[in-house]
């Protein structure tokens, strides 16, 4: 299966070992006018080596050909991908399989979350009326089966961008009716009417919205307009509006949370009826972003995987390099009863060297 997802990486190629992490210290201030909502003051460039399990492979042979073809399609249609904008460490793994995650409504966000590499501004450029057609054309040309479409926050628009998101998805469905669509949506500023207008009769398989971090860290990590409780409300309402859809969310770790807080956050998420969850390591994208507090070992991600399954999540991806849209099509298949997503270091997967073992019901080293 071929899928399509959105995030950005620094530079054209990524080395086998990912970039080092800088030691930074939070400063003061606020966000919303094109600058980061809270500045981070550098106290030095202590270059930490990432743990040994942080390795990924560059594409070769057929994978290199697919990577180049995906790059060409994105550029040809003037599209944005999360793969690039969010500096995703899996870009070569995904693009090497002919997949990408599309980011719509521009490449400038009205929020200033302290973990995110996407540019921010109070008044982003106006929406591109040709974007629905361009997006549909790119997805048709790439011949994918499961498309992930993510969005930037557009608090500058009365409906939060919902009508534009809908136009983009409908254009893709009309051009490629056989393609399964997953939307990774904003919180629409908590506007449930906008959420309803977006979701009613929308031809999608999965509605995803990320809680991002454990509740205690909201004020430290996310824009002041976002919160764990608001995100849960959006996910819960989405399920009420469209009980036929799979709902999905993601948690980043390494931001200062404890292991038990991750488990408790998963319990709260599952209590709202969320079907699918991903957990991955936070990596600092730049000098003005929150520094990494810790690197949980792969065995800890395996424990979270097991606990999430015991809670009743129908699909789980938990590993250091997992991101919310990683191998999304396979994760959707898992949620409908297929085998769990298998990720092995020997395949060049960017997840880790965790593999799923049916004998003990979870991921093992």
Question: Model segments located where?
Answer:
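Non-cysteine beta-strand/loop elements that form the S-adenosyl-L-methionine
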Residues: 144-150, 203-215, 274-283
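A short acidic, helix-capping loop that chelates divalent metal ions and anchors anionic groups
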Residues: 153-158, 215-221, 285-291
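Structural beta-sheet core signal
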Residues: 149, 183, 249-251
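Acidic/histidine-rich catalytic cores of soluble enzymes
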Residues: 189, 207-228
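Conserved glycine-rich "GG(E/T)P / GGGxP" loop and the immediately following alpha-helix
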Residues: 147-167, 256-261
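Cysteine-centered iron-sulfur cluster-binding motifs in ferredoxin-type domains/subunits
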Residues: 103-116
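Auxiliary Fe-S-binding modules of radical SAM enzymes
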Residues: 2-101, 117, 137-140, 167-179, ...
């Amino acid at each position: 299966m071929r899928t399509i997802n959105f995030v950005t990486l620094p530079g054209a190629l990524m080395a086998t070992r990912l970039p080092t992490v800088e030691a930074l210290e939070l400063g003061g201030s606020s966000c919303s006018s094109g600058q980061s909502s809270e500045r981070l003051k550098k106290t030095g460039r202590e270059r930490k080596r990432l743990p040994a399990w942080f390795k990924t492979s560059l594409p070769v042979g057929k994978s290199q050909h697919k990577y180049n073809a995906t790059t060409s399609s994105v550029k040809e249609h003037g599209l944005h991908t999360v793969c690039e904008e969010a500096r995703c460490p899996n870009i070569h793994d995904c693009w090497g399989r002919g997949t990408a995650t599309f980011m719509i409504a521009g490449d400038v966000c009205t929020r200033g979350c302290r973990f995110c590499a996407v540019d921010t501004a109070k008044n982003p450029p106006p929406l591109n009326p040709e974007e629905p057609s361009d997006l549909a054309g790119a997805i048709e040309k790439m011949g994918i089966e499961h498309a992930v479409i993510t969005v930037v926050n557009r608090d500058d628009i009365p409906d939060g961008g919902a009508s534009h998101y809908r136009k983009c998805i409908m254009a893709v469905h009309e051009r490629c009716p056989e393609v399964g669509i997953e939307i990774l949506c904003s919180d629409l500023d908590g506007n449930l009417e906008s959420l309803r207008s977006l979701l009613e009769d929308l031809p999608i398989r999965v509605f995803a919205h990320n809680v991002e971090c454990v509740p205690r860290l909201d004020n430290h990590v996310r824009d002041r307009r976002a919160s764990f409780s608001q995100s849960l409300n959006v996910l819960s309402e989405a399920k009420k509006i469209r009980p036929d859809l799979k709902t999905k969310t993601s948690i980043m770790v390494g931001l200062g949370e404890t292991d038990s807080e991750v488990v408790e956050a998963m319990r709260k998420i599952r209590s709202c009826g969320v079907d699918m969850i991903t957990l991955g390591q936070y990596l600092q994208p730049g000098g003005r972003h929150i520094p990494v507090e810790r690197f949980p070992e792969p065995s800890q991600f395996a424990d979270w995987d097991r606990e999430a399954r015991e809670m009743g999540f129908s699909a789980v991806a938990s590993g250091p390099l997992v991101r919310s849209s990683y191998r999304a099509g396979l994760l959707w298949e898992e949620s409908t009863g297929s085998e769990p997503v298998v990720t092995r270091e020997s395949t060049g997967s960017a997840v880790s060297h965790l593999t799923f073992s049916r004998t003990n019901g979870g991921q093992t080293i």
